[in-house]
Amino acid sequence: SADGSTDKSDKPGTTPDVTGRPASFANDEEMLDYIEKTHLNYMWEGANPNSGLAPERIHLDGIYPQNDKHVVTTGGSGFGIAGLLAGIDRGYISRTEGVQRLTKIVDFLGKADRFHGVWSHWIDGNTGKTVPFGQKDDGGDLVESSFLMASLLCVRQYFENGNEQEKLLASNIDKLWKEMEFDWYRRGGQDVLYWHWSPNYGWDMNFPLEGYNECLITYILGASSPTHSIPADCYHKGWARSGGIKSNAKPYGYPLDLKHNGAEQTGGPLFWAPYS
């Protein structure tokens, strides 16, 4: 059920059964089920054992030239967490095991480095310490953290009326949510959100979040924050650029409607749309 109240998935089995790709599928539904289960396994079987979060990359040969075996990614973990929720609801993994995994994730995130309530893009999955994404990108990443929190809020809603362990999980997520200081990332009260802040480099990354790209979720969450909300002008003047986000471009005869950053005439990459 949509609110997670029906425990239809509480059955034995720790791994979605996807052994061996079938030579053919009886119908599209069977094929899509197989794909969904297989993708779920990246987050279920491939997760960092200590944190439960998604690795930035998995090398099947076990060789990591950049010594990044334990690096987990916050945004990618958000997508994976949404997948776990779907897996629980569809019975690919048991509700009990799913809650245990999600509890591990949330407990880890509560102890990991945060910067005004916001996580870094990369985290050491063993220690919870920030792994710099770039020379000056060693602090809070509002975009990646918003991808993460968007899925955590889905988890909160799914389990908030469950058993005691599930209610505790939902409550701990709510605490992390209320500690995210979206207002801090206005960089001194500007009418725009900023992508990064570092305790070592401050605002040196200097990346205001202006549309259109994959970052709309930051404004949705910022506007709805019960503790650190942003004003409407932040969206209208920052993200929507006081109307400057509109576009009249028609690549291949199709109207873009929105001005795509860096690709105003042709349109940006497709991932911008599903990310937020």
What are these regions (language model features)?
Residues A2-G4, P16-K69, H116-V118, W122-I123, ...:
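Low-complexity, Ser/Thr/Pro/Gly-enriched N-terminal "stalk/linker" regions
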Residues V18-M31, N41-Y42, G78-I93, F108, ...:
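Well-ordered alpha-helical scaffold segments within catalytic/enzyme domains
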